[in-house]
UniProtKB/Swiss-Prot annotation:
Keywords: Disulfide bond, Knottin, Metalloenzyme inhibitor, Pyrrolidone carboxylic acid. This is Metallocarboxypeptidase inhibitor. It comes from Solanum tuberosum. The record marks V38 as: Interaction with carboxypeptidase. Disulfide bonds join C8-C24, C12-C27, C18-C34. Induction: By wounding; in leaves.
Amino acid sequence: QQHADPICNKPCKTHDDCSGAWFCQACWNSARTCGPYVG
């Protein structure tokens, strides 16, 4: 079971804005929020 990441769902402008997260490190530009990393 994954714990919610504190950076998940935070606003972002670039991928690096989410780089401190474990489970939510991708920046979805359409929504401008961090989301689960997709390899």
